Curated annotation (Swiss-Prot):
Organism per entry: Physarum polycephalum (Slime mold)
Membrane topology, record value: Multi-pass membrane protein
Identification of the protein by name: Cytochrome c oxidase subunit 1
EC identifiers of the protein: 7.1.1.9
Positions contributing to Fe(II)-heme a binding: 87, 403
Gene Ontology CC annotations of this record: mitochondrial inner membrane; respiratory chain complex IV
Linked residues for 1'-histidyl-3'-tyrosine (His-Tyr): 266-270
Lineage: Eukaryota, Amoebozoa, Evosea, Eumycetozoa, Myxogastria
Binding-site residues for O2, renumbered to this chain: 270
Gene name per UniProt: COX1
């Protein structure tokens, strides 16, 4: 790419012409920013894009599983496994972690401590820009040769040179390395910020629970990621340099990889959910209008979860031949984790008890979180039993369990935080310096900004509709999976006997409902405010019509085996995009972040 001549007056960027001075201002403000608010906003935008890609992959899987036999993948089972791998890695490393830690963490950890910025602003910037590079490598791994169809665990010997001979797994490993470096740099930054940049007098007992949650999370990252890096580096040398760390024919052991991976993998689960715990605490505190019940107990519960998270990794490995004493220990240790988690759940309920609650969108998502996360935890207690897990291992019961914890735990917390902090994030450059003390003063529960405009609020009705449709969609998708797992349906298999048809069909319809609710979230809840909703109603009608047609009628045709309708879908998508572009012109004045 050639550099821009200094005498050139205009430049074309993404099809738009702008003055070079405007371009340099844009680049300096966004691409090279050291401001934690700009970087946090970019993290959120990146996670939204990655989340949509992950959602699209999951819908493709559910379309394939909507009926017995082959529907859309033409018996290409390797492609199905590649989609499974990409979906998992994208959702974990490029959606949940950038949104909860990079996005909301960067935005609000300094504000909740009274800090001017993060401790290392340039480190903050590079930890952001490593993520798009990592995502590109992961997407390339899916396109190179047969793709990386190993599952997100990348177990050898399937991931070895005999199982995947092409460079696809190598690219996926490099992608994980880059994402790990990004997370490590961010973790160092957060630890230094929280330790050294608090307001004078803001001791640990007065720190926000969200800051505590982020602190425990980044300590877990700092301790667990080097183990993953070592495991995948050994796998890389096994594949390319003739070592035999995980090759039994050369004296290695594939079970060693499983121990190393899950020593990272189980703390990773808590890394994903702990920032969500902090968000739940903040929103419940705001809507109950009182301090969280048992503050110190909540802090110690998070610390206990972090410590115990490193002591239970082998409950993912009950089927590999562990001796009975080892299985007894890991069963007991896993069940003990339910104690601090239960303390947090009951403390939140005790805070809500007796409060006058206005059921706004953020609180609805938090209540959904409490119900569904608890259900997911109960199925986790079942899986903790080493005897029962022999039957449930690698079935859809496990898929249902961790999606109840993540899809309805971490993601519900992210939606709640987005709605709760929406006006601040969208209008942060419009606040005067003296107004920030009203936005977040760590010593006050909440204050209203006097005479503040409400131009940047979301549509409450649209938010509630988004919650209801999402709640119905995710439960329709994942609850039948418990029953499929109990009946013995294995995961990561694109075909199944017709005895499993009805529950799979319900699950697929649930994923389509979730897809529609996500589209509604972008159309009505985020991008457009009330005035635009009224002025742009005719254009919205033209958007909704092809959307309904694609969602219900075309998908039904695909399920029935009519693949000729794919051309019609592409035409309808083209029409849809044209109308979205037309409508976006109406929203230009309402959708400027800076």
């Amino acid at each position: 790419m050639s550099s821009i001549p200094f005498d050139q007056k205009t430049i074309s960027l993404l099809g738009m012409k702008m003055d070079t001075s405007d371009f340099y201002t844009f680049a300096d403000r966004w691409l090279f920013s050291t401001n934690h608010k700009y970087i946090g906003t970019l993290y959120l935008l990146f996670s939204i894009g990655a989340g949509l890609a992950g959602l699209a992959l999951s819908v493709i899987m559910r379309m394939e599983l909507a009926s017995c036999g082959d529907l859309i993948l033409n018996s290409n089972y390797q492609l199905y496994n590649t989609i499974v791998t990409a979906h998992a890695l994208i959702m974990i490393f490029f959606f949940v972690m950038p949104a909860l830690i990079g996005g909301f963490g960067n935005w609000f950890v300094p504000l909740l401590m009274g800090a001017p910025d993060m401790a290392f602003p340039r480190l903050n910037n590079i930890s952001l820009w490593l993520l798009p590079s990592s995502l590109i490598l992961l997407l390339l791994s899916s396109y190179v040769e047969i793709g990386a169809g190993t599952g997100w665990t990348v177990y050898p010997p399937l991931s070895s040179i005999t199982g995947h001979s092409g460079p696809s797994v190598d690219l996926a490993i490099f992608s994980l390395h880059l994402a790990g470096v990004s997370s490590m740099l961010g973790a160092i930054n957060f630890i230094c910020t929280i330790k050294n940049m608090r307001l004078k007098g803001l001791t640990g007992e007065r720190l926000s629970l969200f800051v505590w949650a982020v602190l425990v999370t980044v300590i877990l990252l700092l301790l667990s990621l080097p183990v993953l890096a070592g495991a995948i580096t050994m796998l890389l040398t096994d594949r390319n340099f003739n070592t035999s760390f995980f090759d039994a024919t050369g004296g290695g052991d594939p079970i060693l990889y499983q121990h190393l991976f899950w020593f990272f993998g189980h703390p990773e689960v808590y890394i994903l959910i702990l920032p969500g715990f902090g968000i739940v605490s903040i929103i419940i505190q705001a809507y109950a209008n009182k301090a969280i019940f048992g503050y110190l107990g909540m802090v110690y519960a998070m610390l206990s979860i972090g410590i115990l998270g490193f002591m239970v990794w082998a409950h993912h490995m009950y089927t590999v031949g562990l001796d009975v004493d080892t299985r007894a220990y890991f069963t007991a240790a896993t069940m003990i984790i339910a104690v601090p988690t239960g303390i947090k759940i009951f403390s939140w309920l005790a805070t809500l008890f007796g409060s006058y609650l206005k059921l706004r969108t953020p609180l609805l998502f938090i209540l959904g979180f409490l119900i569904l996360f608890t259900l997911g935890g109960l199925s986790g207690v079942v899986l903790a039993n080493s005897g029962l897990d022999i039957a449930f291992h690698d079935t859809y019961y496990v898929v249902a369990h961790f999606h109840y914890v993540l899809s309805m735990g971490a993601v519900f917390a992210a939606f709640a935080a987005f709605y709760h902090w929406f006006s601040i994030i969208k209008s942060f450059t419009t606040y005067e310096p003296h107004e920030w003390e009203f936005v977040y003063n760590p010593f006050e529960l909440r204050k209203k900004i006097p005479y503040r405009r409400t131009d940047f609020s979301y549509l409450e009705t649209a938010g509630i509709l988004h919650f209801i449709t999402t709640f119905i969609g995710v439960n329709l998708t994942f609850f039948p999976m418990h029953l499929l797992g109990l009946a013995g349906m294995p995961r990561r298999i694109p075909d199944y006997p017709d005895a499993y048809l009805h529950f799979n069909l319900i699950s697929s319809y649930g994923s389509f409902v979730t897809l529609v609710s996500t589209i509604m979230f972008f159309m009505f809840g985020v991008v457009f405010n009330y005035n635009l909703f009224i002025n742009g109603f005719p254009s919205m009608f033209y958007i909704i019509k092809p959307l309904i047609k694609i969602t219900f009628f075309r998908i039904k045709q695909i399920i029935q085996g009519n693949n000729e309708c794919l051309n019609s879908i592409s035409k309808e998508l083209t029409i849809l995009i044209l109308h979205v572009k037309r409508l976006s012109k109406l929203s230009v004045n309402n959708w400027s972040i800076a």
